[in-house]
A protein has these predicted regions:
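Signature of multi-pass transmembrane helix bundles
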Residues: 1-104
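Membrane-interfacial loop-to-helix junctions in multi-pass transporters
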Residues: 2-4, 40-44, 81-82, 96-105, ...
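Membrane-embedded alpha-helical segments of transport systems
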Residues: 3-7, 44-47, 150-161, 229-236
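Alpha-helical transmembrane segments of polytopic integral membrane proteins
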Residues: 10, 49-53, 86, 90-91, ...
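Hydrophobic alpha-helical segments of integral membrane proteins
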Residues: 25-43, 69-72, 76, 102-113, ...
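Small-residue-enriched core segments of transmembrane alpha-helices in multipass membrane transport
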Residues: 33-36, 72-89, 108-115, 183-196, ...
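Helix-loop-helix junctions within the multi-pass membrane cores of secondary transporters/permeases
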Residues: 115-193
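Transmembrane alpha-helical segments and their short flanking loops
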Residues: 163-236
Length: 236
């Protein structure tokens, strides 16, 4: 099953569940979601370091590891700067509507940010994010609805990281790319991030399918993407 088929199936099932409003079917869907999340958390993620270690052993043997690590450091630096720019931009737009200082709004969210650094999970950070959002003057009703909903679907930081890393790897490996192809990839990635599980590394695992089908990433390129993403997962 390719990625487009899986997405169409997911949307069809979602619309069907909503229209039928069957509690039994909804419970089945929730249980299946829990199975997938537990599989990623308990099986796939613990084994990923071994897989990535093997990839780096192979690169060391071929003499590529130093040049790749140097590129990694540059990519991480660029993405960190982009994260800061994105946060300042988003909070500046919000501050225009509420006539407040965006940096004061950002400073009140620092406890949530540091919690996310430690947990590497947007879902686990929800209680702290909710509390700090209320301290920023957001009503309890709005915060209680928006924060749990958007914590795991508004993955703008994950989208930014994956797009930047994919572009850097394609340029580094001399892979052909053009704007229409990458625009389609970004669009599909945005849709995929809506369904990405809110667990450490969940976003990159959800995006592997379109990295392979749309950009032609092989197993080694996917492993490099996973390694890059995991290294930056906590800060955005």
């Amino acid at each position: 099953m390719n990625v487009m088929t899986a997405l169409v199936l997911a949307f069809t099932l979602g619309l069907g569940l909503a229209s039928l409003n069957s509690d039994a079917l909804k419970n089945v869907a929730r249980d299946f979601q829990e199975i997938i999340v537990r599989m990623i958390s308990a099986v796939i993620l613990p084994l990923l370091p071994l897989y990535i270690f093997g990839i780096f052993l192979n690169m060391t043997h071929s003499g590529q590891v130093y040049s790749i690590l140097m590129v990694f450091i540059k990519i991480i630096g660029v993405i960190f700067v982009l994260h800061i720019f994105l946060l300042v931009f988003q909070y500046s737009i919000a501050a225009l509507f509420v006539h407040r200082n965006p940096f004061k709004l950002l400073s009140k969210m620092l406890p949530a940010y540091f919690t996310a650094l430690g947990t590497q999970s947007s879902a686990a950070t929800i209680p702290v994010t909710l509390e700090q959002t209320k301290k920023n003057g957001v009503s309890a009703e709005v915060a209680g609805f928006v924060i749990p909903l958007c914590a795991t679907i508004h993955l703008s930081g994950s989208t930014l990281k994956i797009v930047a890393c994919a572009l850097a790897l394609m340029m580094m490996q001399g892979m052909p790319f053009d704007f229409p192809l990458f625009a389609g990839f970004i669009f599909m990635l945005g849709i995929t991030m809506v369904a990405a599980p809110g667990v450490p590394g969940g976003a990159i695992m959800a995006s592997l399918g379109i990295l392979q089908s749309m950009l032609g990433f092989d197993e080694s390129a996917q492993a490099l993407m996973i390694a890059l993403y995991i290294a930056m997962d906590s800060f955005g």
